[in-house]
Amino acid sequence: EIKACMECGFPANEIVFAGVGKADWEIELALNAGIQYFNVESIPELEVIAEIAERMGKVADVSFRINPNVGAHTHANITTGLAENTFGIAMKAMVGTIRTCSQFKNIRFVGLHFHIGSQILKMDDFEALCLRINELQDMLEAEGITEVKNINVGGGLGIDYQNPDENAVPDFKAYFQTYAKHLKLRPGQRLHFELGRAVVGQCGSLVTRCLYVKKTDSKQFVIADAGMT
């Protein structure tokens, strides 16, 4: 993905490398390219990045993905912010995690990353995330940790599959107003979003070919060469 981004013309210093499983060769590629930072999901991953960065004589900027234990009103299989999900580090472990990070001379802590799920249509879920982020920032500051430059709130804003023609454009206004109202950023902090589906979901067209028409007693089906739906 990093290679694909750069081949498409995106500057390496605007790329953030996320994902729960980063192979050594991918970490090396990212460090050589000079990406903006890594979203780190665990202490073992941090240790691997630190080891590779030291061997390469590089400094890796990292942001920690937090599991805020916030549920989302979406399908159970695409929630990512609950305690039982595989993603991120528990909030209660963050002070110790950041202090562990400071022990590595080739690692620089730059921010916090969150993502509570996909295809979310209720703004209450994003409001709950904001309140958890505020709680975490207060907790870190109480421990003297103030070097949080970036806050990445992930994405998750869904599109209306029930009435796609009537609501072709998601309610971006309500989405951004939720963060503007409820998220308490500190001076100089940068806020990052990972909007994907909401931006491009309605922008494509499926090009397919009719192979044949199948008739049954109750329905008529067009069989196409683009899948089984």
Residue ranges and their predicted role:
Residues 118-229:
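C-terminal active-site-proximal or functional interface alpha/beta core segments in diverse enzymes
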Residues 1-150, 159, 211, 217, ...:
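Active-site-proximal beta-alpha core segment in soluble small-molecule metabolic enzymes
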